[in-house]
C-alpha cells in the first residue's frame, strides 16, 4: 500500500515538473523588449537623465558625476 502511494506521488511529481518546465519557456512574440516598455517615457538629447527613464534612441547618459549626467550622442 505504501509503495503504491509512493509510486503515484513520484509519477505526479514528474508530471508536474514536466508541465512547469514547458510553461516556463518564453516566446519572443509574447515578451516586450525594453524599448517597447519605455516608449513615450524616454529622455531627449540635452536633458538630465535620471535612473528611472532611459535616453531616447541611441543617446547615452553621460556626465562628470552621477548628479550631472545628460543624454548626449555617443
From Swiss-Prot:
Keywords recorded for this protein, A-Z: Disulfide bond, Ion channel impairing toxin, Knottin, Secreted, Signal, Toxin
Looking at the UniProt entry, the stretches that span the membrane are: none
Q: Which cysteines are joined by disulfide bonds?
A: 42-56, 49-61, 55-71
Proregion residues are 20-39
- Signal peptide positions (record): 1-19
Q: Which GO terms describe its molecular function?
A: ion channel regulator activity; toxin activity
Coiled-coil residues are none
Q: In which tissues is it expressed?
A: Expressed by the venom gland.
Role: Probable ion channel inhibitor.
Family, per entry = Belongs to the neurotoxin 36 family. 01 subfamily.
Q: What is known of its domains?
A: The presence of a 'disulfide through disulfide knot' structurally defines this protein as a knottin.
Name this polypeptide is given: U4-theraphotoxin-Cg1a
Amino acid at each position: 500500500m505504501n509503495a503504491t502511494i509512493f509510486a503515484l506521488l513520484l509519477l505526479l511529481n514528474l508530471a508536474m515538473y514536466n508541465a512547469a518546465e514547458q510553461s516556463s519557456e518564453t516566446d519572443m512574440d509574447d515578451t516586450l523588449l525594453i524599448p517597447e516598455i519605455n516608449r513615450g517615457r524616454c529622455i531627449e538629447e540635452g536633458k538630465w537623465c535620471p535612473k528611472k527613464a532611459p535616453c531616447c534612441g541611441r543617446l547615452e547618459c553621460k556626465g562628470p558625476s552621477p548628479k550631472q549626467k545628460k543624454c548626449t550622442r555617443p
